[in-house]
């Protein structure tokens, strides 16, 4: 057996934050910019060996993350500062490591997760924003956040989310368990906060698109429940834009003792 094969293997988890506006999604793809590709390149430079990461949730093009979690395996023994400060020094400015934690062999960023949490940020103002234009979705019609919140409560629990599932979704089942969904207003911002065991493709953005129709008084509150029962994607509203969506947290069993930093996004109170 070679010396290389005898080296111990370390499993490391990282918390990742990124502005997805300049990337073609999380997942590494040929000939396009991805968050995964940039992170793996930076980690490989620090580890001095090729690194492959596994993430909790593969976000789409333009979607952001403040609470993404990844893991990787390496034979490189490094101090925590190397996996945070060192990796950040090799990353572009719109991707950053937030924390590092050594994890046991049975940990997997995706399969060990018990829930994912997203926040969708709507800038509800007559005039469009400039500085935050890629970090929020602009909607100029006045939105009734309390009405949206009431309408959304029918989505709680285990349901068939076919009406809010992208046509190209590859999940084996449309059933998902929504643990909470809250709609609140913070000045000009309307925030849709949703947590579930997992999500079908475009689920959050499709729900938000329909909730905005309710909030603008273009549809009655009962419409969301009717859409859920219909199990027909063609009846729901258009998919909300990617810019306002953030993966803000991923839940894991307490035994892994992973850090839980403020969720953000940072321009909102947590």
UniProtKB/Swiss-Prot annotation:
Residues reported to bind substrate: 118
Keyword annotations: Isomerase, tRNA processing
Region (Interaction with tRNA), start-end ranges: 168-172
Feature type site, description Interaction with tRNA: 58, 78, 110, 126, 139
Catalytic reactions of this protein: uridine(38/39/40) in tRNA = pseudouridine(38/39/40) in tRNA
Record-annotated disulphide pairs: none
Entry EC number(s): 5.4.99.12
GO molecular function: RNA binding; tRNA pseudouridine(38-40) synthase activity
GO biological process, one term: tRNA pseudouridine synthesis
Region (RNA binding): 107-111
Keyword Mitochondrion: no
Gene3D superfamilies to which the protein is assigned, alphabetical: Pseudouridine synthase I, catalytic domain, C-terminal subdomain, Pseudouridine synthase I, catalytic domain, N-terminal subdomain
Listed InterPro entries: PsdUridine_synth_cat_dom_sf, PsdUridine_synth_TruA, PsdUridine_synth_TruA_a/b_dom, PsdUridine_synth_TruA_C, TruA/RsuA/RluB/E/F_N
Active site: 60 (nucleophile)
Pfam families: PseudoU_synth_1
Similarity section: Belongs to the tRNA pseudouridine synthase TruA family.
Function according to Swiss-Prot or TrEMBL: Formation of pseudouridine at positions 38, 39 and 40 in the anticodon stem and loop of transfer RNAs.
Subunit record text: Homodimer.
PANTHER family, sorted: PSEUDOURIDYLATE SYNTHASE, TRNA PSEUDOURIDINE SYNTHASE-LIKE 1
Protein's name in the database: tRNA pseudouridine synthase A
